[in-house]
């Protein structure tokens, strides 16, 4: 195949982006060639053609984002190669360059994204220590986490629902195994070595300004270099890195996030969905971060609660504020798109409309006395008002983006175009009078431009200055010097309007970039106001109460599960009291009685308090916990080759390793994944260890042997769920009371579940027979458990 200059250009650029699908702009299409074309054709279900024996597939340039989304979702990295000059102005081969590389984590366009964060994560490791840098390119947020605990790193990656992992080669296989559905890319070690990238990106004189470890600085440098590579930009929209540290935040393992249903996942209803009554995308993202990272500093928690309380106490102003916030747009992402030259005119309109709300919002905020005044960049607002149409149509260059009155030169060219039709009508009338041809017509098409059309019957009347341009079946088309001059002016006006609109739009965007710092500050303040006002709204709507903090006391009166109560009628409230003297609660009772719901609600109430939220209870006095741990449910880990019991023991090992006397531990049926005797033995030994450690523990179990702990340890208290029997009917009251369950009611639960009557009746027969045999053998009449006692009474 003969290689043309165009194909030489393509091959040269493709060589630089071997690992990407290259979409190569050719006129009105983006074309893919060779193997890329085959992939594009298959994924997008479009026709595969050929150009000079090279497989080729193309997509219209105006529909790029629609097709791009499908390619990225299919797991491909895509390099966009654009024409860098107008074809009409280039007599040689048009200059083309890659303008961005699109991956799941480098997307900034609105139509690709939901309101939630879109994190990529750079993961590095040195000598058993792990560092993860999370980045949402669409908002500029950067988070840094460092730990010697591999599982803690994996938990955070899972909690953040990352869309992309970037790592050195030696970590790829293990990360790919743990996160098989996440796009994972390896980068060379030199990405981690250029620490000057950090200094340049943040304009730092001293790289130690951020107080990050050498490992974290290397990972941050790798992130910056990668974002530069994908965005094809030297100036990045990255916020200063925020360190996720146990000194400031509670670290939640992925099991706890899942077991307490904190955020959207596989378990349906969750705490975030219940609390998320935010009015802005920024507020929703911040609220989710608060839920994933509760505070551990009592002063900071109480400051949030104070703000929420002020809002709750002034419902009229709260409603007014939330109404104003409902008109706020996603400033954070707009700023990012402007910074990376990906913004559209409607972004600037949305930015202006948001900023115009600030003066009125400041008036409302002043009534509460707990919020600082929002910055108001009046000059920028004035520029946006004058420059951008209120309802812009199309892209810059199409003549309907820049307002009239902003540029006198642009207005002149627009006037010329707007009066063109009128001028043509005048010209047409003049030519009819001059020639005497009443059916003479002036028209336009894209091939020949402007023309005068005369029927063949009138050809004898045409003047000498008419120059033939085209012959049709029944007519001829002509041009005159005057019409040619008019056409030149019109075409020049169209071209100049396109140039001017693009230039003016770019200049307005440059002005927005100059205000980036203040706009991001406004965005952060709006997010915080929205999140706090949402917590106040939740408190009012759901009848929550303000929690009070204590050194060691956990007292909840009339506690409710914040998620379950939203979808259940007549939810039963429950109380709990724990302190350093009584800090370990064993809860027995049948299935379906509400044991799991109860211990989860204690965890959720504690967590909600530490994000600064009011809580679902009549009264709540709580300690500030450093961690909340959970071991609940039965699940295996097929990808990791772990059985249900091994998963359970791994999670318990983590709890025993990490918990302190400031931790809350919630256990549900620990030990049931093995034989009864082994299970009870393990559960008892774990309980002893946690009692000695001083954690506050709620342990829901079917092992009645564990109720004997109360006789050996004064810190233990037994609770059960009250069950009422009316004839053959069993009523689960869901009420937690002191005591020990005397029956499991397993057969009754099976009956409620719809097991056939013949099976239920047979089960009763077997139960009765075993009961009689056990009574004869042991001389006891406890129908709850037929297990052999392992510990002295």
UniProtKB/Swiss-Prot annotation:
InterPro entries per UniProt: DNA_mismatch_repair_MutS (IPR005748), DNA_mismatch_repair_MutS-lik_N (IPR007695), DNA_mismatch_repair_MutS/MSH (IPR017261), DNA_mismatch_repair_MutS_C (IPR000432), DNA_mismatch_repair_MutS_clamp (IPR007861), DNA_mismatch_repair_MutS_core (IPR007696), DNA_mismatch_repair_MutS_N (IPR016151), DNA_mismatch_repair_MutS_sf (IPR036187)
Family matches, as SUPFAM superfamilies: DNA repair protein MutS, domain I, DNA repair protein MutS, domain II, DNA repair protein MutS, domain III, P-loop containing nucleoside triphosphate hydrolases
Keywords recorded for this protein, A-Z: ATP-binding, DNA damage, DNA repair, DNA-binding, Nucleotide-binding
SMART domains linked: MUTSac (SM00534), MUTSd (SM00533)
Molecular function GO terms recorded: ATP binding; ATP-dependent DNA damage sensor activity; damaged DNA binding; mismatched DNA binding
Keyword DNA repair: yes
A family per Pfam: MutS_III
Gene Ontology CC terms, in alphabetical order: cytosol
Binding positions for ATP per the UniProt entry: 589-596
Origin superkingdom: Bacteria
Signal peptide coordinates: none
Database matches in Gene3D superfamilies: 1.10.1420.10, DNA repair protein MutS, domain I (3.40.1170.10), MutS, connector domain (3.30.420.110), P-loop containing nucleotide triphosphate hydrolases (3.40.50.300)
A single BP term in Gene Ontology: mismatch repair
Classification via PANTHER family: DNA MISMATCH REPAIR PROTEIN MSH1, MITOCHONDRIAL, DNA MISMATCH REPAIR PROTEIN MUTS FAMILY MEMBER
Function: This protein is involved in the repair of mismatches in DNA. It is possible that it carries out the mismatch recognition step. This protein has a weak ATPase activity.
Family annotation (HAMAP family): MutS
Family, as annotated: Belongs to the DNA mismatch repair MutS family.
Name of this protein: DNA mismatch repair protein MutS
Gene designation: mutS
